[in-house]
Regions:
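Terminal accessory/targeting
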Residues: 1-199, 283-289
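Conserved residues at the C-terminal ends of beta-strands
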Residues: 3-4, 253, 278-280
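Residues within well-ordered alpha helices
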Residues: 18, 171, 238-239, 266
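Short secondary-structure junctions
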Residues: 25-29, 247, 274
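Conserved hydrophobic/aromatic pocket- or pore-lining residues that grip, position, or stack substrates
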Residues: 121, 220, 267
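Metal-dependent polysaccharide deacetylase catalytic core of the NodB/CE4 family, i.e.
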Residues: 124, 128, 149-150, 166, ...
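Short, surface-exposed, polar/charged, turn-prone segments marking secondary-structure boundaries
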Residues: 144-148, 210-211, 277-280
């Protein structure tokens, strides 16, 4: 417990981050066992200027919002990473957490090597199935007119070239030290950037349910979900219903900006606890580390 008479939302968020990093309960308050700490006051009113070193860990947490305010945006409103001051080879958040933990006697492995997590976005679960009868008929006619008999044969006899469940099952057996995290896109309405499968298709639901029996599956919200009232709720609801468990992780469509605090608050209200979509528009990596 870090001593503070009136901890606010910023203190709560930092406490949650430290708890996850250290593996122990961290909070701010005035209990008898509370420890003193160097309080620069930055957490009272977080701004866009980097705070003193003592609050550097909190700064990493807030940097997503800082860059949201300052970085140049692309045509979809996503921050451009080429102007961000960062080094993708340095795990800043981890180093700050270790350094701060040492100061308060919390033991952390200095050379811990986490197991790799491979993130798989399923934008198109199937090439042919699960897209509605109009798409199926129209696609078949197109393939016949083009003379694409291989595609016609795949439509009739399979296997579907996009359905990769068997591949990932073999991957998991070959690399048991790794973890797979899937994010499935179930767009309620088709659009320019949403041309995937239908969430009400029995074939789609069965395939996702089977995938969820072995791997972690989260929601991959569609481009159009940002523009429809209740769009997040509807698509996350489909994933909840199919898997039979609450959806705790989500990842925004790559073309949508993921740094909006109102968006994250909306997801929190829907029960989502982890956002995996902090990409820049033009460079690899995450904004906060």
């Amino acid at each position: 417990v870090f001593r503070h008479a009136r901890p606010g939302i910023a203190h709560q968020r930092v406490a949650q981050l430290l708890s996850a990093a250290w593996g122990v309960s961290v909070s701010f308050g005035v209990s008898p066992e509370a420890q003193s700490w160097v309080d620069s006051g930055w957490l009272e009113a977080p701004g866009t200027h980097e705070p003193r070193f003592e609050d550097a860990f909190a700064w990493i947490l807030w940097r997503t919002e800082y860059w949201e305010l300052t970085l140049e945006k692309d045509g979809h409103g996503r921050p451009m990473g080429r102007s961000a001051m960062r080094d993708v080879m340095i795990p800043e958040a981890e180093l700050r957490a270790i350094e701060l933990a040492e100061a308060y006697g919390v033991s952390l492995p200095l050379k811990g090597k986490p197991s790799p997590t491979v993130v798989v976005d399923i934008d198109h679960l199937f090439a042919y199935r699960g897209r509605g009868w109009r798409s199926a008929v129209g696609g078949a006619v197109r393939d016949v007119l083009r003379g694409d008999w291989r595609a016609v044969a795949e439509r009739v006899n399979g296997p579907d070239p996009f359905y990769s469940s068997a591949y990932w099952a073999k991957w998991a057996s070959r690399f048991p030290q790794g973890t797979l995290q899937f994010f499935v896109l179930l767009a309620v309405e088709q659009g320019t950037y949403d041309r995937g499968v239908r969430p009400d298709s029995e074939a789609v639901r069965a395939a996702i349910k089977q995938l969820g029996m072995r791997f972690e599956v989260g929601a991959h919200l569609s481009y159009g979900s940002h523009d429809r009232s209740g769009g997040f709720r509807t698509e996350i609801g489909y994933v909840d219903q199919i898997l039979g468990v609450p959806t705790l992780r989500q990842r925004f469509h790559f073309l949508r900006n993921a740094g909006s605090l109102p968006q994250l608050q909306s997801l929190t209200e829907l029960g989502v606890r982890e956002d995996w979509s902090d990409e820049f528009a033009d460079t690899p990596g995450f904004r906060s580390g």
